[in-house]
Amino acid sequence: VEAVERQLTEFFKINDEVAAVAEKVGGLLPREPYVPTSISEDVYQSIRFAQLEHCMVVLHGDAGVGKSKGAQKFLKDHPTNAVGISITPSTGTLRSCIKRLARALRVPECRNKMDQMLALRNRLDGTNQVIVIDEAQHLKYAALEEIRSLTDDNPMTGEHGIGVVLIGNSEVYSRLQGRQLAQFA
């Protein structure tokens, strides 16, 4: 009981401190979490383009310029036909990436990568979904190739693919343009 009381006391203390700081700087912070900039608006429109054209778009640039904020705004504005995931160095592998995507789409997890990709494809085929992957520079080559395949039309059903947007630093673009360009196409 004492341990729980200590944890609750600490929790409420931290909440009070956060509220006090927010009150002090409240006038300095924007009221809206999204402030449109030319870059964030370009990101927003590029995601829409990928969705409408069922293609892959790669958006890259320096950190802090508005790429992620534009993507977050799009995902908030289109909750039924857009899904976003963020990749980290530990989730850039094919297995981790498709597991994260399956969770975001509420597709049951499968035992192996092939079955998981088939389940994802079945869920996505014929929809106007767009997948937004932030921090895409962490994707390994196999994950990039599988994600790219989601834009392809399904040869078995004829259903069109979906839009995919990769957002990251310039490394993601360099990797696609570099020695793997011939393989990736």
PLM regions and their residue ranges:
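A short, basic N-terminal segment
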Residues: 1-54
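Mid-core helix/loop region of P-loop NTP-binding domains shared across ATPases and GTPases
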Residues: 25, 93-100, 107-150, 154-165
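Walker A/P-loop nucleotide-binding motif
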Residues: 52-73, 89-90
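Sensor-1/coupling segment of RecA-like P-loop NTPase cores
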Residues: 56-64, 139, 151-181
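Short hydrophobic/aromatic beta-strand immediately N-terminal to the Walker A/P-loop
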Residues: 56-60, 84, 132
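Conserved catalytic segments around the Walker B and adjacent sensor/switch elements
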Residues: 78-90
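A short helix-turn-beta junction within AAA+ P-loop NTPase domains corresponding to the substrate/partner-engaging
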Residues: 80, 178-185
